[in-house]
Amino acid sequence: MHRRTPSRAAGAVALAAATLVAGCMNQGTPSADKCETVTAPLSDVPTRTDQEPKMRIPVPTGWERTTQRDNESIRYAIRNPALSADDFSPTAVVTLQQVSTRAGKPEKILEEQNKQLTAKLKLTDVTTTPTTVCGAPGLSSAYVAPEVVLGAKLKIPPRTARSLGTVYRAGDTYYVATVTVQTVKPDNPTYQQDSEMILKGFQLLPSQ
C-alpha cells in the first residue's frame, strides 16, 4: 500500500487550505461574466476615486441623461419625458454610498438600508427579494413612495418604485450601489419593459 510522506501530506493540506481560502475570497465578488445581458446600450456611471466600483446602467430608447439632482450620493440619473404623466417623468437613479465593513455582512447592510428607507418615507407596503448583481449580493425592493410637497403649487404625486441594491467590497470599505426606477403610471407597457431592462442589466464590477 502506498503511504504519503509527511511532506506530501503537508503539501496536500496546504493546497486544500489555499483552495478553501481562495473560494471564500471569491464568494460574492462581482465579475462581468455573471452580469445579465440586455439589448439596451450601457452607459458608464462616472467614478470619483480609483477605489470605487465600476457601474453601468442600461439606457433604453427614449431615456435621456439628467444631471439636475447629481450630488455626492446621486451619481447618475436618466428619465423618459415621452412617458410623462401628472407632471412627472419616469426616472432611474443610481446612488453610491460607503459603509464600513464593521457594519456587518452585505446582506445585513442591504436590509438595514431598506429599513432606513422605509422609516424615512414612512412606507407600509415594501416587498423585498434577495438576488445578485453580477455575482455580488443584492436586494430587490418594490414599494409606493408617498406624495412629496415641495411648495404651495409644486407636488410630486405618489410613485410606484422598484429598487435594486448591491454591495461591493474594497479593502475595509463596502460600496453600496442602488438603482431605483419610479413612475406614476406603472401600467404603461413601455415603462414596464424599460424599467425591467434597467434593473436587470445594471452592472457593478471591480474598479480594476
Question: Predicted regions span which residues?
Answer:
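N-terminal targeting sequences that direct proteins away from the cytosol to non-cytosolic compartments
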Residues: H2-A77, A82, K155, V181-Q208
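Extracytoplasmic
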Residues: D50-K54, D87-T91, A136-G138
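Hydrophobic alpha-helical segments that drive targeting, anchoring, or assembly
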Residues: D70-I74, P90-V99, R159-A161
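A short acidic-to-branched-hydrophobic micro-motif
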Residues: R79-K108
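Short glycine/proline-enriched loop/turn "hinge" motifs that connect secondary-structure elements
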Residues: L83-D86, T166-T173
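Short, well-ordered beta-strand elements
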Residues: A92, T173-V184
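Solvent-exposed loop/turn segments at secondary-structure junctions
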Residues: S100-T101, A145-V148, T183-D187
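Signature of long, low-cysteine stretches enriched in small and polar/charged residues
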Residues: L110-Y168, E196
